[in-house]
Every structure is written in structure tokens, then in C-alpha cells.
């Protein structure tokens, strides 16, 4: 609808009737100068495809999608790919229970420091290829609620997350027989604290993480102290404090 509207800077869609729309793929793709968009009244209740919806909106700094109804969406591939100026992203009410594809979903969101996707239901997701690749400002990523039992492609999922200090993937399962886990942690922060379940992780994943000097922690809970999420176990807390003094 607005694909490649490179001159579009502001958009207030308060009066748009989107109640019958089923496909929003590429809707704002390559709106390279879009700085502000109001989608609070968007009706997305019938939408099944949000592929590349905001891809390459390189000037967009804030996006509140908490009003979106996504309970029918199957495809979120590249949804925020290339939103390089994005600082604030509100996905609090996203229902991802039917989503099958999250490939490149947050790739190249270079200025995103924090991302709360604790509400995501990923039990039907099959692809997470490069999902967070080159999110090089992201400091903490808590994915302890992620269900990856159906995922068969994780290659490059955290590649280029060069500022990542804490990563919790202890719930990750690698059940699919031909699952691709190549280069999951390429160019990640070498002082990163990672939390995994070693008993449920393939040798390839463990070998990749052996390059990181910090102790891993399994069965880890996270707590919020002074608006910072830190691991509860003593070994991880010591590593975290040593890394932040």
C-alpha cells in the first residue's frame, strides 16, 4: 500500500478501515524517510501475513504496535528488518501462537538496546534464521519462554549481536533431526553470559559457546534489579558484576 513511499515522513492512519485486510506484507517496506506512524486504530484481526511490513523503515525511531491483533498471523519474516534507527518497539500484546516464520524478524535493528518479547508464543515457529542478526546494540535478551521444538533453522540467529551481555536460551530445544544451528553466535560479545540447558543442547551449539569465557548457567531464573535483568545464580552474578565494574 505504501511500499517504497520514500517521501513519506509522517502518517496518521487513525481513520483507515483495515477490517477486511488479510495481507499486510510489505505495507511500509522501504518507506526510508518515515519518522512517525500512528497505527493505534488499525484492525488487524484478519491479517495472516505481515512479512516485511516495516522492513527498511530506516528513520523510524519508535513503534507502538500494542493494539495489533495478531492471532491469525502466520508469517512475520523480516517484519522489522533494517529498522536501523528503531529505539523503542512495543509488542506487548502480540499473539504469535500461529506464526511459523520469524526469519530476519529483527535483523539489522542496530539501535535497539532492549527488546521485551517475553509474551511471544513460538510453539509453531519453524524458522528463526538470523532473527536477531546484527542487533549490535542489544544488551540483554531473555528468551527463557521460547519454545523451539518445531524450529528446524536457527542459523545465524544471534550473529553480530556484538553488545549482548546476557543471553538466556535455557528453554531452547533442538528436536528437529536436520536442524541448522550454524553460526548462531558469530561475532557476539566475547564477555557475554549465556544461560543454556547443556543436557538439551547439541554438540555443535556447545562447541560454538566454548569460545566464550564466561561460565554458563543452566536452570537459571532472572530477576529485575534497578531495571536491569541479571541471572540469579551466584556464578552468573559474579560474572555479570565483574563485567560491569
PLM region spans:
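Negatively charged
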Residues: 1-244
Amino acid at each position: 500500500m505504501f511500499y517504497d513511499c520514500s517521501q513519506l515522513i509522517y502518517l496518521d492512519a487513525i481513520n483507515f478501515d483495515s477490517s477486511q485486510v488479510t495481507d499486510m506484507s510489505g505495507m511500509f517496506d522501504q518507506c526510508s524517510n518515515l519518522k512517525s506512524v500512528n497505527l493505534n486504530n488499525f484492525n488487524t484481526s484478519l491479517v495472516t501475513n505481515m512479512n516485511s511490513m516495516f522492513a527498511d523503515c530506516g528513520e523510524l525511531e519508535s513503534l507502538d504496535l500494542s493494539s495489533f491483533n495478531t492471532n491469525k498471523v502466520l508469517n512475520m519474516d523480516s517484519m522489522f528488518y533494517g529498522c536501523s534507527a528503531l529505539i523503542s518497539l512495543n509488542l506487548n500484546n502480540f499473539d504469535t501462537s500461529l506464526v511459523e516464520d520469524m526469519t530476519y524478524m529483527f535483523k539489522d535493528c542496530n539501535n535497539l538496546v532492549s527488546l521485551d518479547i517475553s509474551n511471544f508464543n513460538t510453539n509453531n515457529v519453524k524458522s528463526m534464521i538470523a532473527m536477531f542478526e546484527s542487533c549490535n546494540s542489544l544488551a540483554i535478551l531473555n528468551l527463557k519462554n521460547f519454545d523451539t521444538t518445531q524450529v528446524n533453522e536457527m542459523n545465524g540467529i544471534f550473529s553480530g549481536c556484538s553488545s549482548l551481555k546476557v543471553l538466556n536460551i535455557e528453554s531452547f530445544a533442538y528436536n528437529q533431526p536436520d536442524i541448522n544451528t550454524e553460526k548462531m553466535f558469530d561475532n557476539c560479545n566475547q564477555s557475554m553470559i549465556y544461560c543454556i540447558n547443556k543436557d538439551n543442547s547439541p554438540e555443535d551449539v556447545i562447541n560454538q559457546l566454548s569460545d566464550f569465557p564466561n561460565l554458563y548457567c543452566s536452570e537459571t531464573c532472572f530477576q529485575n534489579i534497578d531495571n536491569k535483568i541479571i541471572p540469579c545464580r551466584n556464578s552468573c552474578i559474579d560474572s555479570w558484576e565483574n563485567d560491569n565494574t
